[in-house]
């Protein structure tokens, strides 16, 4: 039980500092907001979580304003539980990504599981039925025992929650780097489908309307979780287990179905709905009121509790999972109670909407908080941080390009070593723990460029992916940010989809350090540039800052989640070569792009140098490939990324056990170059003429570089290895390293 302090004791002890408030912020609350009154224990705690970076984006709000967020396809952008994009037929796709980084280091299983649960609630709070989960994971070196434990438990947590609730985990990415050793990244994306008429907002309006608490009971888990996520890791952070929530996917399944039933069958009495996520009850209710320009009066005696003698501070800040807030029209309370009772869930009237603009709490007949509602939400502070270019950036800019030399005798061994690199090697051992087929909508499961799910009742499908190569951002945040969006779009296009929009998780270091704030704001410039060029507005997202351990920051890692629309399921394309005799086509030119590459990291142990990125060529090549797919000319398509052409060719050959015979005018090293904007395609010989005719109508570059064979040999210039041996290395590397 938390011991409550008096307002005077709070001021004297400055305990608010431990909760994340600065002296200046505390004085602002006391003098400017409360007119000289000392905030009490509950009020101070509420401001501490609501003014955390995790809740109010006080350091990143100016950066987020750079993003393009509108477009004809966007029905709802940032500001609600998730973004909503039109896909025609009065249907929309709803999606968002969230981070659960700090909790997943302290308690990897529960941290990852509750990260999944939280983002699922964001989706069904919009009225959508969740249809897919994707993840983006970053870990330290896998030869470290602690890292292996975190990998094992994080993936088990995601699998456990998704498998139990019955939502398929269909895609994602995993990468390893020293910078994540003390600060893994666990980003989870959820995608849902909705009819336009059921789209909801998180708002509490209409004087006298009732505020309902629904779902699981409140405990003491997760108190100050939002503040915990807004600080650097230090030597004692691993012991902060009370800040980590505990999830129950079976409870969430009931909550999901109950909320969907309310929205679809009782939408006329539902004013607003929101998930109780970070900062729990105070965040959800104050945000709903602030967005509507209302006030709220809540009676905490009615809050369902699973622990005894909880004080208002604990009830308001608890981040117990599987809880929602509903605003219901006055006079219809019993309908809500009866509906949730059918699912054996609590549905309790805890307050009402007012018109005084205040957030007022009562407990045991006493007023325990009375503050302006906007001061908790819309009027939280915003900081304009100093940005300074890190010294390393100038060094990289002035340096020569990294140009490795690989002899004919060494190229096959280099290729084998690259196949076994943890970031490149097959993640099959991870994604096979996920149920990717439940709900029976999955057409393309994990392992291809993007996951693809059919849209039932239509001839359409959705392609979805997560992407980011943080090494590029370390060398050049602007170009790296632009590349992250472009690679996500390449994955969608290679699957036959037209990119629609993105969500993001901006994982960066301490924004109070000018060099790290520069990384954030510069990466946002690059993301915006690609979003504008590729017509993929930012419709939702999340910011996770202070990803540092003992002063050492992670690589800047803005994860991009993207969804694309496949208008006709016949255009769904996968990366594997289909049959011997098909021609292998390279779209895009290959240059000496080794800075930040997997090859550079493997051969030198570091990354350095300057990177190039031609966004105009990227767009041209993507448009050409998508047109070739929709014209029915392509049998397979795969984007080139880590490991370059050689790795992409191998991955395309693996699934069906085929061979390749490729002769291409490249040096041995260039087989592993990571020039952007490239695809490997396979086409039937009878489609070659039509393909080349289409090429003449585009400014894209393309050449036939070989053919698919059935001899089981991967031959690329002087590189030669059996497909079976390559598959064995590729699929066996990660399980071997995890032992």
UniProtKB/Swiss-Prot annotation:
Mg(2+) 2 binds at residues 122, 275. One of its GO terms (molecular function) is ATP binding. It is an enzyme of class 6 (ligase). Part of the phosphoribosylformylglycinamidine synthase complex involved in the purines biosynthetic pathway. Catalyzes the ATP-dependent conversion of formylglycinamide ribonucleotide (FGAR) and glutamine to yield formylglycinamidine ribonucleotide (FGAM) and glutamate. The FGAM synthase complex is composed of three subunits. PurQ produces an ammonia molecule by converting glutamine to glutamate. PurL transfers the ammonia molecule to FGAR to form FGAM in an ATP-dependent manner. It catalyses: N(2)-formyl-N(1)-(5-phospho-beta-D-ribosyl)glycinamide + L-glutamine + ATP + H2O = 2-formamido-N(1)-(5-O-phospho-beta-D-ribosyl)acetamidine + L-glutamate + ADP + phosphate + H(+). Gene3D superfamilies: PurM-like C-terminal domain, PurM-like, N-terminal domain. Signal peptide: none annotated. CDD domains: PurL_repeat1, PurL_repeat2. This is Phosphoribosylformylglycinamidine synthase subunit PurL. It is found in: Cytoplasm. The active site is at 54, 100 (proton acceptor). InterPro entries: PRibForGlyAmidine_synth_PurL, PurL_linker, PurM-like_C_dom, PurM-like_C_sf, PurM-like_N, PurM-like_N_sf. ATP binds at residues 57, 96, 504, 541. Monomer. Part of the FGAM synthase complex composed of 1 PurL, 1 PurQ and 2 PurS subunits. Pathway: Purine metabolism; IMP biosynthesis via de novo pathway; 5-amino-1-(5-phospho-D-ribosyl)imidazole from N(2)-formyl-N(1)-(5-phospho-D-ribosyl)glycinamide: step 1/2. Its EC number is 6.3.5.3. Keywords: ATP-binding, Cytoplasm, Ligase, Magnesium, Metal-binding, Nucleotide-binding, Purine biosynthesis. SUPFAM superfamilies: PurM C-terminal domain-like, PurM N-terminal domain-like. Substrate binds at residues 99-102, 121, 245, 319-321, 544. Mg(2+) 1 binds at residues 98, 542. It holds the Pfam family FGAR-AT_linker.
